[in-house]
């Protein structure tokens, strides 16, 4: 595993950035597809996509920095080093919402209609982005006993752990609640590998990738075809589906941002779900 997919002299191109670029391209393409289906202004959709992407990136980065402020105060040059990772998806959502509200006010359009366009592209883009997290060895899960793992850097500590596990009886192995057949051992140069060298971890970022793909299927192939949708119908369902996904994945993640003694993603996700359900029930007007 190597976070760099291409190196030309001193210039390094990272998978992290590549996945974001692919996510942006796919998201904009899907947004334009919806616009054509609904006879919507293509230029407006493209301009909105640009604003949503930029505001989402800024929001995601600021959110992450605020929750890790001591580190960035000591390492201020790392603030702009986004290729090292460090984006918070809830911050990205909040930043995207802020950008949407500003854009909608300038263009004098209902922001919920823009949200309906963005729902499918957003969650698919988030799924693609998790591949970049995997290549960076970040947003990883907790250690797990597992009979199989992808090993990139082996040291005696792992052999001792694995030998002990293999010596257990089948019934004893079944007593481990975290037993899964797909643990991943990351390079020690990565955040996951430096924190848990030579230990198999839950690939939490891949769990989220799968859940987001399922969420995209629900939004794109089921909810999108529902008639008599209210303004924001697709957007609020996107918030609910992604928030549920995030709550599930957070149980496996090890470095989630904390809000007092609670995981910040759990707190924010529950609030977002409650708000979304409220607005879904509030109106039942057809969008388009």
Curated annotation (Swiss-Prot):
The chain crosses the membrane at residues 8-28, 49-69, 79-99, 109-129, 203-223, 232-252, 259-279. PROSITE patterns: LGT. Keywords: Cell inner membrane, Cell membrane, Membrane, Transferase, Transmembrane, Transmembrane helix. It is found in: Cell inner membrane. PANTHER family: PHOSPHATIDYLGLYCEROL--PROLIPOPROTEIN DIACYLGLYCERYL TRANSFERASE, PROLIPOPROTEIN DIACYLGLYCERYL TRANSFERASE. Belongs to the Lgt family. This is Phosphatidylglycerol--prolipoprotein diacylglyceryl transferase. It comes from Fusobacterium nucleatum subsp. nucleatum (strain ATCC 25586 / DSM 15643 / BCRC 10681 / CIP 101130 / JCM 8532 / KCTC 2640 / LMG 13131 / VPI 4355). The gene is lgt.
């Amino acid at each position: 595993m190597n976070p760099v997919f291409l190196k030309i002299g001193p210039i390094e191109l990272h998978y992290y950035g590549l996945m974001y670029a692919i996510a942006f391209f796919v998201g904009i393409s899907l947004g334009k597809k919806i616009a054509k289906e609904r006879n919507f202004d293509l230029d407006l959709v493209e301009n909105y996509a640009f604003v949503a992407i930029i505001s989402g990136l800024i929001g995601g980065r600021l959110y992450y920095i605020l929750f890790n402020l001591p580190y960035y105060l000591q390492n201020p040059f790392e603030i702009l080093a986004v290729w090292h990772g460090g984006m918070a998806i809830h911050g990205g959502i909040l930043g995207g919402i802020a950008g949407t509200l500003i854009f909608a006010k300038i263009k004098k359009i209902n922001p919920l209609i823009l949200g309906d366009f963005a729902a499918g592209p957003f969650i698919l883009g988030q799924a693609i982005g998790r591949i970049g997290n995997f290549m960076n060895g970040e947003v990883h899960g907790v250690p797990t006993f597992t009979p199989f793992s992808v090993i990139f850097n082996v040291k005696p500590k792992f052999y001792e752990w694995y030998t002990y596990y293999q010596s257990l009886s089948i019934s004893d192995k079944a007593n481990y609640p975290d037993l899964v057949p797909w643990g991943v051992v990351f390079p020690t140069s990565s955040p996951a590998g430096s924190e848990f060298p030579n230990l198999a971890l839950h690939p939490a970022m891949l769990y989220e990738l799968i859940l987001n793909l399922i969420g995209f299927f629900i939004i794109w192939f089921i909810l999108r075809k529902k008639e008599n949708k209210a303004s924001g119908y697709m957007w609020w369902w996107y918030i609910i589906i992604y928030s549920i996904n995030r709550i599930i994945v957070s149980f496996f993640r090890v470095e989630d941002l904390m809000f007092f003694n609670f995981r910040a993603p759990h707190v924010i996700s529950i609030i977002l779900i409650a708000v979304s359900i409220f607005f879904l029930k509030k109106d039942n007007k057809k969008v388009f």
